[in-house]
Structure formats: C-alpha cells, structure tokens
C-alpha cells in the first residue's frame, strides 16, 4: 500500500502556495466525509517532501504492542492500584527476547526523536516546527514506522513520568528521582488535571496509530492506483500521521512544563483547549481511517472472491479421480475443520465420509418450507429402509448434504434468532449437514448463484464420485420418481419419461396410498380443487348423486390449491370436507404441497428436456390443471388409471343438470362419455372455453422458460409477460413470475 501512497503524492509534488490571502478552501475526500483544507493540502506536499524511505523494515506490530501496554498503564489515574488491575503480559521472557531484537534496530531513532521533541518544546519552538523536524529525522521510515517510533518516544517520556508518580510513596529510589526531576507528586490536583486532560487525547492517538498500521499492512496487489476512490482516500494517511505526531508533541510539552515549573504549574485554559481540539481532530481522522479500512477490506474481499470464483470454476472444469477436491472447495478448505454433522449420530465428521460417493447437495436458505423438508425426509428415509443389506447396514449409493446459505453471512453472525433457526432446521435432519453457514464462503455462494442458478429456493445439485456435476438440480426428479431417478442424470430422466404416460398413476404416485388403491378398471375417480367452499359442496353432492343414479363406483379427493398463500384457508376447507363427509381430503398440508410441486416438477422437467411441444400429453394435461386452478374450481376425472376429462369450474353446472339433460344418454354412451359430451357441447357453448393462463415461478428449480407456448384450448400462441409478486407465506427474498 505504501507504493500506492507514493504514486498518489508524486502527482502532488508540483506544489502550490496560498498567495491569495483568502480563507483556505475545503476539499471533501469522497466516500469518507473528511474535509481537507487547502492549508492541509499544502502541508501534505511539505510532508511528502521529507519522505524518502529506504529498504529497512520496522516490526511495527511488536513495537506498537509494547507502546500500547506502557500507555495503557500510564494513562490510568495516578493511584497505583489502578495500574495493578491490568493483566500482566504472558510469556514475558519470550516477549522480552523478541522485543530486544526489534528495539536494537530502532532504539537510536526513538531516543533521537524523544530528545528532539523534549529540547525543542522547552526552547519555545512551535508545534508545527517540531512536527516537521520529527518528519526530517524519520524520513527514511515508512508512514507507519514514523508514527509508531514517535509514539514510542512519547511512551518513553510519559511512562517514566507516571512510573515515578505511582511508586513515589513506596520506593525511596522513585521518590528521590521524582524530586530530582521536579515531578509534583504531592500536588494531586495538578496531576489528576493533567491525567484527565491527556487521557482522551492519548486514547485517540493510539486509535489512529492502530488504523495507520493496519492500513499499511494491506496487500499491495489489491490496493492499486487503478482504484481511484481507494487511492484518493488512502492519500490522507500522511495527514493522519502529522496530526498524531503533533498531538504527541502537545502531550510532551505539557509534561515538560509541569516538571519545569513544578508545584506552581497548573493547566491553563489554553492547554485544555488545545488537547480538546486535538482529541476531536484525531477522532475525526480515526473515523475516516476506520471507514477507509472498511472500504479497503470490502474491496479486497471482492477481489479475492473474484479470484477464488475463477479457481472454483476452473476446478469444476477439470477432471478428477474422486470428488474430494470439489467438495473441499465448496465446504471450507481448512484441514483442521470438521465441516459436517452426521444426521444420525449428531457428531462432527470430515468430508472423507463422502469420498467416491454420489453426493446430493441440498442447497437452501433458512426459509426452506417444512412441507418440503417433510416430504424429502420421507423419500430419503424410505430409500434407506429399502436399501438395508443382510448385514443390517444401509447401502445407499448416494449421500445427502444440506448446504445452508445465509447471504450476507454477517446477518447470521449477529443474529441469535437466525442461529437458533439454523439449529432447529439442522438437528432433526437424518442426512449430513454443513455444520455452520459460516463455512460456506462468499465466493462459493456467488458460484452457486451463477453456475447453478440458486435463488434461495432449495435446489439439489448432484456431484458424482469423480466430482462431476451429474445434475444442476435433481429436485424435480426426486419429487416425480423419488430415488428411482438415481443417478439423477439427464439420460436417466429421459429414460424414465419414456416409460410414463399421462395417467392418474403418474399424477398421484407416491403421495397417497388411499387414492392409489382406488385405481381399478371399473372405478371412477374425481380429483378436484379450489378455494370456494360453496362450489365444493354443490359439486361434490351433485357428482355423488349422478354416480349413484348411474350405478357407477365414484371416489372423490380434494387436492387443495397451488397458491400456498391460501394455505390456512385450504386447511379449513379440508377440515369441513372431512367433517361433512363430502369426499376424501388430506389432513396433512404437506401432501397438498407435494401434489402441486410434483405437477410443477413434471412441467419443468419436460421443458428442460426440450419436450414442451403441443403434442405431449403430459405437458398438455398439466397445463390444463395449472391453468384451471388459477381460474378457481376444477376437476379431473379418470376411469381407472386413464384420465378422461379435465374441466374448470363449469363442471359443477354439468353435474347439477344431470337429471334434465345427459342422464338419458348414460345407458348408451356410458357415464364418462355422456358427461363429457354434454359438458363440451352444451355447457361450454354457453359459458365459453377458458384459454390457458398459468405462472412459471422463476427459480433455479424452473430453469429455462420456453420462448413460446401455444394455448391448450385454442392452439394459438400465448402472450408472455413478467410480473413480480411478494410471497410471505413461502418466505422468499426474491420471486419473479412469468405469466402465460
């Protein structure tokens, strides 16, 4: 960073003088709020002219620690009991040995500065002159070195003064030395006044020095002149050094005046004003430097994150013999960390437990739906149960790892509520979990958002035993086929679809054994949905009446509504349906969530495979259900597994006019044919056929959205437009919809 400051100041050495006699103007340093007067700008050039550092290095950290220890003990009240309250430094011999090597190279410079300040302050030189003299003496040191050496010279003077004060009453040697140096130890009022007046200033001196040292340690590779905002604000470091050294001189001058005038010395109003002014000045400088540090660290983190991101992309584009390099890069690379928690034993384990296994990374934020976790756990637990060998152990060909994402991670670190929420989610999980969101570094989150399209909603990335990405999101395959989709590749997905037809088996498979057991050749089954309880009552009672009169076996099941914001309303409707015995209805809301999620997953799966054409029965059927659900009530009728009809809310009218219209056609046409003909030929002719209208929720799960899509009713191209909706029920941070 030193090279940056030098290059910045090299452009300023042309210099200019304030010859106008006008009041100095103020220049605002961007992004900091720190104003620099034109006088300070000229002073900056004078300071820079004294700055010609050589190759020597000062171990400023060690020296600063020693200086801070002296000042911390010396700036207490003069009562020696206070000094004894500070903890003694540990490893004293080791510290003394290392400090001796540091001081060997700089002790002469410290003594020289101490003598220069003491002499010139007693001879009446003004503070600015003495400060510039210190800069001349320390011209060969870097900015942090100048400041720490000057502070060490001050600690030498100030520490000796207070050491004599603290031991005056206990040690005859201290008493004699105090008398020889004219320290007014018996004038407690004077000493306490000096201490109170200087403590605030010394505290600010230490704070500014610590910031300057920290800024000087920033790596040059990231803080470069091509970042103008950073280079501009860093160029104010010499001014910070100037005012801190000037404050040192003010403190030493006051101590020297006390020892020179002895018991007659009292702080003047001017002395108090000067220390107060300097303390305020340094506080403003410290605030500016602290903000500068924050900006620099943010810039460095961004640069390092960018570098790490490139490395991570390169790693995924490289062939590996196993998956360990990939998993280590994703879940904290430090070898001493045990980054996983075993869901069964609740013990921390190393990543080695995943070596050469297919790994399913369940990536989500902390707002993952309990319904989603519940269904996923059922699928996971059942698959483990089915794969238990004769040895009693599970032989699953894959492992699941939950990867919790909190972005920004600072929210997690300062929020006990989020930490408790994470633990409540992790602890019941039977699979592996990353032990803390803090183990997922920022560039990894950026990688997941960019490469895997993670958008807070859960995704399931599959890493094969060699570390390759088998699937960027296999969650829709899990919802449709469960673990039968293993190894979750595109070819496996295509193979499974070749075996499927649009049937009731596909729609309800894995959800409810009751409905699945209804699927017999002579059974008629109505699945229906909506949130209008009056419509539901009319439809179910009319449908059951038609079935009874037609002497057919009809079963009915209520499946709720796709929009999860209606969750509580749907729960109450479901309770009424069961209490009034209107039809079968799921008591567990998670099953309704699963039903609609499976339909969406089928739609997205077809789209990703490029099968979103208008001749695909699965696509057409799902589009109808999703579209009719958006309009209100709807129903799907099947005979056995065969789906024979999908209708919107007008199906209730078709049922209610049974006696007056299509009843007479049932003996000749059959129950479904008579109903369907009347519905399409009579009811829809009056009510009209509703064209398609449904939403794609833009998340990583949905993947790409088709450029065009035809209406399933009129076959004309559908209009596409974008909308944004806030979904508090799903606790999403971001949600976009594409409406067709």
From Swiss-Prot:
Organism of provenance: Arabidopsis thaliana (Mouse-ear cress)
Expression sites (tissue/organ): Expressed in phloem sieve elements.
Protein encoded by which gene: SEOB
Biased composition (Polar residues): 1-23
Location of region: Disordered: 1-27
Disruption phenotype: No visible phenotype under normal growth conditions.
Any single GO BP term: phloem development
Transmembrane segments: none
Disulfide-linked positions: none
Protein name (Swiss-Prot/TrEMBL): Protein SIEVE ELEMENT OCCLUSION B
GO molecular function, one term: protein homodimerization activity
Role of this protein: Scaffold protein required to form the phloem filament matrix in sieve elements.
Subunit structure: Can form homodimer.
């Amino acid at each position: 960073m030193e090279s940056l400051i030098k290059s910045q100041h090299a452009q300023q050495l042309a210099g200019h003088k304030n010859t106008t006699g006008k009041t100095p103007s103020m220049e605002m340093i961007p992004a900091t709020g720190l104003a620099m007067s034109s006088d300070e700008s000229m002073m900056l050039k004078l300071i820079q002219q004294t700055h010609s550092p050589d190759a020597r290095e000062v171990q400023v950290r060690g020296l600063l620690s020693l200086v801070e220890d002296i000042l911390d003990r010396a700036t207490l009240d003069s009562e020696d009991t206070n000094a004894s309250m500070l903890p003694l430094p540990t490893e004293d011999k080791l510290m003394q040995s290392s400090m001796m090597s540091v001081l060997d190279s700089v002790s002469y410079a410290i003594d020289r500065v101490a003598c220069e300040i003491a002499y010139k302050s007693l001879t009446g030189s003004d503070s600015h002159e003495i400060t510039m003299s210190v800069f001349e003496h320390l011209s060969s040191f870097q900015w942090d070195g100048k400041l720490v050496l000057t502070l060490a010279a001050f600690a030498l003077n100030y520490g000796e003064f207070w050491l004599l004060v603290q031991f005056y009453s206990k040690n005859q040697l201290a008493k004699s030395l105090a008398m020889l140096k004219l320290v007014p130890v018996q004038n407690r009022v004077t000493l306490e006044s000096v201490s109170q007046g200087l403590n605030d200033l010394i505290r600010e001196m230490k704070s500014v020095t610590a910031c300057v040292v920290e800024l000087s340690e920033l790596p040059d590779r990231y803080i470069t002149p091509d970042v103008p905002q950073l280079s501009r604000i860093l160029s104010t470091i010499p001014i910070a050094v100037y005012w801190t050294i000037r404050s040192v001189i003010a403190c030493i001058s006051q101590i020297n005046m006390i020892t020179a005038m002895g018991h007659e010395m009292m702080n003047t109003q001017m002395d108090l004003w000067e220390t107060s002014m300097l303390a305020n000045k340094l506080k403003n400088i410290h605030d500016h430097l602290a903000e500068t540090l924050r900006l620099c660290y943010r810039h460095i983190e961004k640069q390092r994150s960018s570098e790490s991101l490139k490395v991570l992309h390169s790693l995924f584009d490289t062939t590996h013999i196993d998956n360990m390099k990939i998993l280590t890069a994703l879940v904290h690379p430090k070898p001493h960390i045990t980054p996983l928690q075993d869901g069964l034993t609740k013990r921390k384990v190393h990543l080695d437990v995943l070596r050469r296994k297919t790994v399913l990374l369940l990536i989500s934020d902390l707002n993952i739906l309990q319904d989603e976790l519940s269904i996923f756990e059922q699928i996971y637990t059942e698959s483990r149960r089915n794969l238990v060998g004769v040895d009693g152990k599970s032989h699953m060909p894959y492992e699941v790892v939950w990867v919790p994402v909190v972005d920004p991670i600072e929210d997690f670190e300062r929020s006990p509520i989020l930490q408790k929420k994470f633990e409540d989610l992790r602890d019941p999980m039977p699979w592996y979990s990353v032990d803390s969101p803090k183990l997922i570094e920022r560039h990894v989150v950026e990688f997941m958002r960019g490469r895997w399209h993670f958008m807070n909603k859960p995704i399931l990335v599959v890493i094969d035993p060699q570390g390759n990405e088998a699937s960027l999101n296999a969650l829709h395959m899990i919802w449709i086929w469960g673990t039968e989709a293993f190894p979750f590749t595109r070819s496996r997905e295509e193979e499974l679809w070749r075996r499927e037809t649009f049937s009731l088996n596909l729609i309800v498979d894995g959800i409810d054994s009751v409905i699945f057991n209804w699927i017999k050749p002579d059974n008629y089954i109505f699945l229906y949905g909506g949130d209008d309880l009056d419509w539901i009552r009319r439809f179910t009672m009319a449908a059951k009446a038609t079935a009874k009169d037609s002497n057919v076996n009809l079963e009915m099941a209520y499946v709720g509504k796709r929009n999860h914001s209606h969750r509580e309303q749907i729960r109450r409707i479901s309770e009424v349906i069961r209490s009034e015995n209107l039809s079968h209805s799921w008591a567990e809301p998670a099953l309704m969530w699963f039903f609609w999620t499976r339909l969406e997953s089928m739609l997205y799966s077809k789209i990703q495979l490029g099968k979103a054409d208008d001749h695909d029965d699965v696509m057409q059927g799902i589009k109808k259900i999703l579209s009719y659900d958006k309009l209100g009530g709807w129903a799907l009728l099947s005979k056995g597994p065969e789906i024979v009809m999908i209708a919107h809310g007008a199906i209730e009218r078709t049922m209610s006019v049974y006696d007056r219209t299509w009843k007479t056609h049932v003996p000749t046409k059959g129950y479904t044919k008579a109903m369907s003909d009347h519905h399409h030929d009579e009811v829809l002719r009056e009510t009209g056929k509703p064209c398609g209208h449904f939403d794609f929720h833009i998340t990583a799960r949905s993947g790409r959205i088709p450029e065009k899509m035809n209406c399933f009713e009129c076959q004309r191209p559908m209009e596409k437009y974008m909308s944004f909706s806030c979904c508090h029920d799903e606790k999403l941070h971001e949600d976009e919809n594409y409406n067709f």
